[in-house]
């Protein structure tokens, strides 16, 4: 029996009433994963033994009626550390790495008696926009198995969209939660930088990375954020601002809310059908009582260039720790220390990771630092100032999540620049450290379109309020791919 059509609140009621046990729910979820995995390839590791052990322990002490997440399964992106469960970052470099600690986000989930059911596929070290750079497999879009799921958190998105699991965690450095959420018609939130601890997240771009939730609905997404968001002394970038309940504004109307629509988000590079879908969404928000006005974010056009200098520079530094000495892959043909370093990194990293390490090393090198890294930092400040000006007069910003719908497998993975431009609309949010959500907003030729809502820092409650209001008057979130029902 499958429970994948039940909301978290409905599952909680069943667990509290003892109509099902945590073990039965876990077993049903494992079956949902196994029956769909060959078709979509969402998971690198399914932690069946660990999950059933956790479920048995929860059943033994009883479901906590006051704890919504007690006994609820959770899928976790494979760059988030999980004790006793392999954490590979989808790389040959970490193919056998089993952490001795949990990431704070995972520890928070365990503290609420959630059950980690497995680790999801991703682009290697979160570098990619299609989940095709994974060392292990290519994940497929839940709606069309010939299309990419987006990236880098592709497995976390398809696991939810295909009905394998109700909730999952991803990470977002330049759009890695929101883009796959859009491509698979689920809800994905990138929180304000510092809202969720980065402790235990395998670092890519330290000034950009943020862990966030995937769910089928806005409310369930907020409920999962309630679990994982916390201040953390182990993370120096943990934000001091704390929200008591991210669901608190869900259900309120949005009459009088002022929403900005940047003209740059509907300009060059945006598919006409995506633009039409967004403009239809604007009418929905206006019908709900919000005011939507056109604005300008003039420096957003530089976002992709700025991002790939800063993110690659940070990655080139962060990935120096992977050298074959302490853990992970080590080349067996090395005859001395230099060869251990060179051969291990040459063989252990994939092409995209090596490309970004080289780009970042170049940007930080003597003679080029001022021209590239320093200049990128200055333009990043201009992008932040653009957002600040808009948010002085508006509550939220609205636009498409992606410039196109999901593209075909093996179509852009040999064209890095085209792949990078797929993050055109999500990258500025990371550069500014802002919260952004992607929600289902329609379909083009049978493929999902995502609508992005962006807020000022710590405005997740307002984002959820507006997203839930839109969700309540549309049915896109209720439409499911064929695989959700069990058919391939």
Curated annotation (Swiss-Prot):
Record note on quaternary structure: Heterotrimer of A, B and C subunits.
UniProt xrefs under HAMAP family: GatA
Enzyme class: ligase
Family matches, as Gene3D superfamilies: Amidase signature (AS) domain (3.90.1300.10)
Alphabetized GO MF terms: ATP binding; glutaminyl-tRNA synthase (glutamine-hydrolyzing) activity
One GO biological process term: translation
Organism: Streptococcus pyogenes serotype M1
Keywords attached to this entry: ATP-binding, Ligase, Nucleotide-binding, Protein biosynthesis
Protein name, entry field: Glutamyl-tRNA(Gln) amidotransferase subunit A
Catalytic activity: L-glutamyl-tRNA(Gln) + L-glutamine + ATP + H2O = L-glutaminyl-tRNA(Gln) + L-glutamate + ADP + phosphate + H(+)
EC number: 6.3.5.7
One Pfam family linked to the record: Amidase
Protein family according to the UniProt entry: Belongs to the amidase family. GatA subfamily.
């Amino acid at each position: 029996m499958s429970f994948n059509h039940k909301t978290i609140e409905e599952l909680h009621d069943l667990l509290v009433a003892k109509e099902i046990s945590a073990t039965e729910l876990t077993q049903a979820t494992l079956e949902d994963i196994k029956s769909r995995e060959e078709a979509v390839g969402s998971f690198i590791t399914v932690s069946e033994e660990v999950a059933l052990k956790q479920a048995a322990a929860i059943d033994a002490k009883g479901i906590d009626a006051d704890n919504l997440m007690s006994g609820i399964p959770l899928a976790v992106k494979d760059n988030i550390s999980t004790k006793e469960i392999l954490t590979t970052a989808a790389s040959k470099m970490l193919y056998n790495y089993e952490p001795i600690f949990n990431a704070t986000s995972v520890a928070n989930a365990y503290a609420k008696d959630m059950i980690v059911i497995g680790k999801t596929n991703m682009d290697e070290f979160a570098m990619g926009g299609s989940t095709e750079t994974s060392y292990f497999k290519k994940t497929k879009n839940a709606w069309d198995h010939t299309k990419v799921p987006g990236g880098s958190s592709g497995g976390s998105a398809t696991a939810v969209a295909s009905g394998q699991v109700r909730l999952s965690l991803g990470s977002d450095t330049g759009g890695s939660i929101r883009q796959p959420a859009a491509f698979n018609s689920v809800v994905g939130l990138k929180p304000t930088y510092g809202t969720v601890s980065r402790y235990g997240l395998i670092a890519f771009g330290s000034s950009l990375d943020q862990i966030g939730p995937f769910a089928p609905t806005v409310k369930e997404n907020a409920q999962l954020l309630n679990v994982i968001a916390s201040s953390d002394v182990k993370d120096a970038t943990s934000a001091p601002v704390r929200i008591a309940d991210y669901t608190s504004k869900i259900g309120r109307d949005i009459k009088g809310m002022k929403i900005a629509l940047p003209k740059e988000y509907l300009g060059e590079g945006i598919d006409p059908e995506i633009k039409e879908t967004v403009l239809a969404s604007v009418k929905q928000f206006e019908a709900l009582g919000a005011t939507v006005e056109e604005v300008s974010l003039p420096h957003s056009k530089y976002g992709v260039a700025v991002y790939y200098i800063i993110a690659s520079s940070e990655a080139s530094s962060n990935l120096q720790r992977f050298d074959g000495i302490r853990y992970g892959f080590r080349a067996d043909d090395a005859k001395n220390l230099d060869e251990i370093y060179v051969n291990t990194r040459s063989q252990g990293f994939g092409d995209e990771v090596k490309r970004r390490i080289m780009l970042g090393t170049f940007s930080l090198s003597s003679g080029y630092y001022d021209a590239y890294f320093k200049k990128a930092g200055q333009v990043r400040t201009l992008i932040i100032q653009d957002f600040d000006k808009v948010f002085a007069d508006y509550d939220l910003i609205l636009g498409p999540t992606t410039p196109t719908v999901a593209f075909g497998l093996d179509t852009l993975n040999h064209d890095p620049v085209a792949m990078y431009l797929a993050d055109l609309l999500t990258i500025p949010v990371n550069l500014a450290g802002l919260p952004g959500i992607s929600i289902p907003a329609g379909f083009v030729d049978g493929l999902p379109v995502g609508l992005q809502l962006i807020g000022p820092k710590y405005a997740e409650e307002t984002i959820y309020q507006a997203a839930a209001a839109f969700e309540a008057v549309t049915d896109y979130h209720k439409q499911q791919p064929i695989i959700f029902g069990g058919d391939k």
